[in-house]
């Protein structure tokens, strides 16, 4: 085996390790490389933010809401605008249950080839579909990928651009045990968890959710929305800037 091939295999192994294990040591690097994105919110309070992407879904979103209610937990739902227009009753139910709605763009697809005008228009269409009122506004790009200029445009529209620090890649349908393990090992004050309720079949995510919530409780952590975590934070989102938590 040549040194070049060994180097390629080593890099591939490292990439797979980072992708599937998500060591916390990678976070500071990501934060320095992408300062327009928030991955976690520093806080001394025992709080973790839970978020769900790609809804609302007429079958799976209600199941997630029922589990959250049973565990007295709250979350931020990053909703796709065109799906919100198809299911306004679910948007209303999410809000009525005390959860937070946030902008996940109008369609579910890559943003990389969208013009600035199209990006701004779809961002505003989704905001109108969700009825986002005054207060902190959060945007998560589809697939977690956007050009720097698009992130700056979102910020110019008053949005904080949010990713996360515990993501089990549930759209790839990994085992329930992996979803539970990956999220649970990364549950620390200030963690932002990314899960999906709007993918084709999030059954494993829904099965893992009660276990994740129970693990957080055993760690003495309370599950809240991103806005609530920001209000208790030291830094990260603008709403945390005046916090006395640190």
Regions found by a protein language model. Give the residues of each.
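Active-site beta->alpha N-cap acidic-glycine motif
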Residues: 22-112, 118, 124-125, 129, ...
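Short histidine/acidic/glycine/proline-rich micro-motifs that form metal-
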Residues: 79-84, 107-110, 145, 167-170, ...
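His/Asp/Glu-enriched short active-site or ligand-binding loop at hydrolase and phosphoryl-transfer sites
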Residues: 145-147, 151-186, 220-232
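Charged helix-capping and loop-helix junction motifs
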Residues: 116-123, 175-181, 206-211
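N-terminal Sec-pathway targeting helices
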Residues: 1-12
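C-terminal domain-boundary segment and adjacent tail
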Residues: 24, 28-44, 70-72, 203-246
């Amino acid at each position: 085996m040549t040194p070049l091939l060994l180097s390629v295999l080593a890099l591939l192994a490292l990439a797979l390790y980072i992708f599937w294990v998500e060591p916390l040591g990678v976070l500071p690097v990501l934060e320095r490389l992408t300062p327009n994105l928030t991955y976690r919110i520093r806080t001394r309070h025992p709080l973790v933010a839970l978020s769900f992407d790609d809804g609302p879904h007429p079958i799976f979103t209600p199941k997630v809401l029922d589990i959250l209610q049973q565990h007295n937990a709250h979350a931020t739902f990053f909703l796709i605008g065109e799906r919100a227009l198809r299911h306004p009753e679910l948007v209303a139910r999410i809000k009525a249950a005390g959860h937070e709605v946030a902008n996940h763009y109008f369609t579910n697809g890559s943003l990389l080839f969208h013009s600035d005008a199209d990006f701004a228009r779809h961002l505003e269409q989704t905001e109108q579909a969700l009825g986002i009122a005054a207060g902190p506004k959060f945007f998560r790009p589809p697939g977690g990928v956007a050009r720097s200029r698009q992130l700056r445009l979102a910020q110019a529209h008053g949005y904080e651009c949010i990713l996360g620090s515990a993501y089990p890649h549930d759209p790839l349908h990994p085992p329930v045990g992996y979803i539970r393990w990956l999220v649970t090992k990364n549950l620390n004050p200030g963690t932002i968890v990314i899960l999906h309720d709007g993918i084709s079949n999030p059954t494993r995510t829904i099965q893992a959710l009660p276990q994740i919530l129970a693990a957080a409780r055993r760690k003495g952590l309370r599950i809240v929305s991103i806005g609530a975590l920001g209000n208790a934070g030291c830094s990260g989102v603008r709403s945390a800037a005046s916090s006395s938590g640190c």
